[in-house]
């Protein structure tokens, strides 16, 4: 039965609905309720009022220290009367002119909230951003009753409401009231030099592809949030100018850097007080029901799963020098995911090394990546040059001066495809940073874990980042599957024409099919019946008899490959045909490896 309740538009409305929190949670489960909420990722701040209902989508990049705040407090007026004011979902305590807060009142209630530092999805590809923006509701400034310029200054000149701002929390520091700020004729913060730059404060994992940042304050279920997870928050925007550390009384501040990192300008990094959240299973906006999809997307008809699979495999074959086996393995890689974990391994990962790339194909790796980024919601291309390895920050590192987890290029959201290009490597010396970079990459590939450096210790955080390595020889990095490309000589000559043809083939309607297919396949379930488990066990025994080198890793690889081959063909259960196809492909792959020079073939398969 549809819920008659509406989403609250102000913190006070939300406080009034708290008694029926179950109904509010049910309301938030309806994805259509999210459609009309402005998406902060694509809505300029000057179009939004303070305390507007908004949403923000991104990756949890850091989790800040707990904050104690006044959840409910008593206010005294000049005539001696008292009232109770709600402090939840606000940064600044709300009092009218002539009122004071009684900090010693018995009825005061303190609460705890946590701040999540969230960045827009690192590596989100252009087509994903454009589609999210297309789904974002347009804000009519007239409906807000103000012009853009007044919206930008609302917290500074908002005295028409006869409201003032006092202390956010007596346990932190005193914020000046709006009238005190207003007395200063200079722009806020103009007289104080900036300690930290905006790039450091925003903390984008991929500096050459900067993210937007938002500090999201959550009020419950703190333990359910995980670092690097994809989330979509709904709550109240907080852009009061007094939140900026540059406006604070800082004479007694021992660490100015930490103060500024914790309280950056809200116009650089807005705050959002969340009362609703959904963990996103993927970053593909085409399949997100909480986004209002364009009519043409909803009504478009699509061919069968098998037909799309056939077309996509043909496209990949065209891009891979007419190598059908390479197309099968690359497609399996593109739909792979870690679907289970044990103490010893991450099950389902499919790190792929496509090696033996022709040396005379200039910039082939970047051209192949340009095709892949059109298909994937999020991905990142990394040239494995000495400069990159020796200078880039790969793993997150805690900065105790600012109490921030400074991001690294490997801090990516789940299912962000990482493409490593070893074809651009040159001879030279790896410095200490380069050695650590290779170690971090190897650890990510082998364990699907990201090491975070807290200086005195390290913590492993779970990751789910498919890694594709493109190389001429065997990669220096480990992988689950190494596949030497068997390039057709004619296809090598025509590779540029083939890649141009691939771009021409990817018309908008076909792109939509491929994008939906890849995400749907990756999130599909797959089962192995008891009958086929016995078949697999017997086949493995036969394999061991025929080849003494076969081990448990080989069996695990076959299981992962057969699962992906089945899912790619629209199956949800393993059958004999798919299992035999996987064993056939693996036999061909191993035969290719044996044909490599001995120095390469002796390496781990």
Curated annotation (Swiss-Prot):
Pfam families: MCM_bind. GO terms for cellular component: nucleus. GO terms for biological process: cell division; DNA-templated DNA replication. The modification Phosphoserine is found at residues 147, 150. The keyword Lyase does not apply. Keywords: Cell cycle, Cell division, DNA replication, Mitosis, Nucleus, Phosphoprotein. It comes from the Eukaryota. The keyword Glycoprotein does not apply. One of its GO terms (molecular function) is chromatin binding. InterPro entries: MCM_complex-bd (IPR019140). It is found in: Nucleus. Transmembrane segments: none annotated. Interacts with the MCM complex. Belongs to the MCMBP family. Associated component of the MCM complex that acts as a regulator of DNA replication. Binds to the MCM complex during late S phase and may act by promoting the disassembly of the MCM complex from chromatin. PANTHER family: MINI-CHROMOSOME MAINTENANCE COMPLEX-BINDING PROTEIN (PTHR13489:SF0). This is Mini-chromosome maintenance complex-binding protein. It comes from Drosophila melanogaster.
